[in-house]
Amino acid sequence: MKLTNRHGLPEPFVMFEEANKYSRGGAEISVTSLIDSPQIFRLKEQYSEELEEDVADRIFSILGTAVHAILETAEAPDTIVEERLYAEFGGKLIGGQIDLQTLHKNGTRTLTDYKTTSAATIRYNPEGKREWVNQLNLYAAIAR
């Protein structure tokens, strides 16, 4: 995907995004790709070299990466931070990186996925977006 800067954001934003390449590890498909439309996933894979995205449209993603980096440094006892897990479903290796797992004495764990978003998103989705719920459910399936 080609990165543009049509809105003239400061160069460090562009440099960060150019260096910040997502990896799904050894997985054939990531949880975040799986919760998206299959058609969108296929088209993004097929036309990745032709697609363009402006760095201004990635501001929440950039802020999210910064928040994740900060929270990664605060690993408390009985927690696992930013662990990538894999599981096979239907002959495909699915991978996902869980932001925080809190381990409980009874052997269970609580999964947390941090989100940075706008106030409007929360105003119109007080329970969270459906894809966020789907993402956590897939993480839970992989973590089992």
Predicted segments, located by residue:
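Metal-dependent nuclease catalytic cores that hydrolyze phosphodiester bonds in DNA/RNA
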Residues: 1-111, 118-134
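An active-site-proximal "capping" alpha-helix that borders the catalytic cofactor pocket
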Residues: 132-143
